[in-house]
């Protein structure tokens, strides 16, 4: 299947640069995955499409302030480090710019020495394995010295970093936000619960591979990045009960979808408490075992994310919906509007 099948024209001015003041005031396109029919709503009206006994599955990962600015200990040369993935203990997979002169043995200093690192290894795609040393707790030091790593297509500075977190973010570890969840407010979640709709949480730590373009013509040859996920016993029990009682499982975001499908594939369509790494790549032809509905933002052309939603709703339905979204001036990408596919 050719990557160009997932291309579409997107005017640059439709790429949202800032979040709306009211999270739930985003627009919501409701897409019927059977017929392709489209309705236009406000996001807070998503509740009218959810039924008692359904379950929304949210990714409770929290974005790290993963961008660090420092210098090489020997020369004082400036470096920028982006934390990608914790390997074990204080060893991290990172991107370093400029990276050519950061080789195994190179020492880096951040915040006047509050945080230090040594390069242990070089990786493909310009990656580096760094081992950090510090006083106290790593994430406290990171909160003091690090900056929020916004996606490359967002050019404007974010006034309030919490707007790039969901209101329910708690498990720190992501290099990017699970953006479908950015539209929910505490008030909307309370109203959803009061209607008898279950809310369950999984964790998937989003890596920057989310933004890595597909660089092969044939998508079957694309290798997905691996990301850490976990599901609790409480969430597994809720989901199995909802499924047994005939309720719908509605994933909030492609990250929740990939977690749910990974686990359902491993347990014959059921859910179980577990943690691990997933590199599942979902594209048309995939048979879904876990989800009945999907809340998602509008994605980049030729991205693995538009391939996933095309697998769920049909490529022609999705490309038509995106054509309508452009015509109707929907806002795209991380700070943009949302789509509900049911």
Curated annotation (Swiss-Prot):
Alphabetized UniProt keyword annotations: Cytoplasm, Queuosine biosynthesis, S-adenosyl-L-methionine, Transferase
Similarity-based family: Belongs to the QueA family.
Cellular-component GO terms for this entry: cytoplasm
Record localization: Cytoplasm
Listed GO biological process terms: queuosine biosynthetic process; tRNA wobble guanine modification
Subunit structure: Monomer.
Protein name in UniProt: S-adenosylmethionine:tRNA ribosyltransferase-isomerase
A GO molecular-function descriptor: S-adenosylmethionine:tRNA ribosyltransferase-isomerase activity
Associated pathway: tRNA modification; tRNA-queuosine biosynthesis
Functional summary from the UniProt entry: Transfers and isomerizes the ribose moiety from AdoMet to the 7-aminomethyl group of 7-deazaguanine (preQ1-tRNA) to give epoxyqueuosine (oQ-tRNA).
Record field: catalytic activity: 7-aminomethyl-7-carbaguanosine(34) in tRNA + S-adenosyl-L-methionine = epoxyqueuosine(34) in tRNA + adenine + L-methionine + 2 H(+)
UniProt superkingdom: Bacteria
Keyword field contains DNA damage: no
């Amino acid at each position: 299947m050719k990557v160009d099948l997932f291309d579409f024209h997107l005017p640059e001015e439709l790429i949202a640069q800032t979040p709306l003041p009211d999270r739930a005031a985003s627009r919501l396109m409701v897409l019927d995955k059977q017929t392709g029919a489209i309705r236009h709503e406000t996001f807070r009206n998503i509740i009218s499409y959810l039924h008692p006994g359904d379950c929304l599955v949210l990714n409770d990962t929290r974005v790290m302030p993963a961008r660090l600015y420092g210098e090489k200990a020997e020369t004082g040369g400036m470096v920028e480090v982006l934390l990608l993935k914790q390997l074990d203990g204080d060893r991290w997979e990172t991107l370093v710019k400029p990276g050519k002169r950061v080789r195994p043995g190179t020492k880096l200093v951040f915040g006047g020495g509050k945080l230090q690192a040594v390069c242990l290894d070089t990786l493909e795609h310009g990656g580096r394995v760094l081992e950090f040393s510090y006083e106290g707790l790593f994430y406290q030091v990171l909160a003091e010295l690090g900056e929020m790593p916004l996606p490359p297509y967002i050019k404007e500075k974010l006034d309030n970093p919490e707007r790039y977190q969901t209101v329910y973010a708690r498990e720190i570890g992501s290099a990017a936000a699970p953006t479908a969840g950015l539209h929910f407010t505490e008030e909307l979640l309370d109203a959803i619960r009061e209607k008898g709709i279950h809310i369950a949480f999984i964790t998937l730590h989003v890596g920057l591979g989310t933004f890595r373009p597909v660089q092969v013509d044939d998508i079957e040859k694309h290798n997905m990045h691996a990301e850490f996920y976990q599901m609790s016993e409480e969430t597994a029990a809720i989901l199995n009960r909802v499924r047994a009682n005939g309720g719908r499982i509605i994933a909030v975001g492609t990250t929740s979808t990939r977690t749910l499908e990974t686990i359902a594939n491993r347990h014959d369509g059921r859910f179980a408490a577990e943690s691990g790494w997933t590199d599942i790549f979902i594209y048309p032809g995939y048979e879904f075992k876990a989800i009945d509905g999907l809340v998602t933002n509008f994605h980049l052309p030729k991205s693995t994310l538009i391939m996933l939603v095309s697998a769920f709703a049909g490529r022609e339905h999705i490309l038509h919906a995106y054509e309508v979204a452009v015509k109707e001036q929907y806002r795209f990408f991380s700070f943009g509007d949302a789509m509900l596919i049911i």
